[in-house]
């Protein structure tokens, strides 16, 4: 577990107080794992909040593209920077949770694109038959077909070493699916290994 590893590195630092390289590496690992635990705690609290009646604070968003732009402007920590395409749909969502969901999906897409030259991410919202359809598409590493049915399970990681190295906790997609479900929507994932992934969430568009 992260705590066991952190304790191990803390013991190593205590055992080698004069070894500057060991101190630097151990401190870096402890910092990284602490960040991962913080992200995990925040995600678990969000999941618990979704279980409470009346947890959603729905507001009318006159332009769903602004939600995508908000995600694009948040500190991402990695590249590529996503491109935004929006038809200006009007939606009623819990703005904070919806942005959290889109940001988690964007961070997942960025992890999938790491080390792949020319990889790209697109955040899109378009109208389809009275629905506002949000998609997060990447041209990253893709998800193996055998893993695809399980990726929204809490703590399930397709590539544990890759996910942990990038700060993942294995709960991001589970949280995204729960946020979508709380809005009466369904999160759907299509992916081809070595080609890329598209995540789709559709909610009713609010018509004038």
Locate each region found by the language model.
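Short alpha-helical segment of the dimerization/phosphotransfer core of two-component systems
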Residues: 32-37
């Amino acid at each position: 577990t992260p705590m066991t590893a952190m304790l191990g590195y803390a013991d190593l630092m205590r055992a080698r107080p004069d070894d500057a390289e060991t101190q630097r590496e151990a401190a870096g690992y402890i910092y990284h794992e602490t960040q991962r635990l913080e992200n995990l705690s925040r995600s678990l609290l969000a999941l618990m909040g979704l279980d409470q009646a009346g947890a959603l604070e729905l507001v009318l968003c006159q332009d769903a593209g602004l939600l995508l732009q908000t995600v694009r402007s948040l500190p991402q920590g990695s590249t590529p920077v996503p491109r935004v395409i929006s038809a200006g749909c009007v939606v009623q969502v819990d703005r904070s949770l919806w942005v959290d969901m889109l940001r988690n999906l964007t961070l997942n897409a960025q992890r999938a694109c790491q080390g792949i030259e020319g990889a790209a991410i697109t955040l899109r919202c378009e109208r389809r038959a009275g629905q506002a359809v949000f998609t997060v598409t990447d041209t990253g590493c893709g998800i193996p077909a055998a893993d695809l049915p399980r990726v929204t399970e809490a703590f399930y990681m397709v590539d544990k070493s890759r996910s942990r190295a990038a700060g993942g906790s294995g709960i991001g997609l589970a949280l995204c699916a729960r946020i979508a479900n709380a809005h009466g929507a369904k999160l759907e994932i299509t992916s081809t290994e070595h080609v890329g992934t598209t995540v789709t969430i559709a909610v009713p568009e609010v018509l004038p």
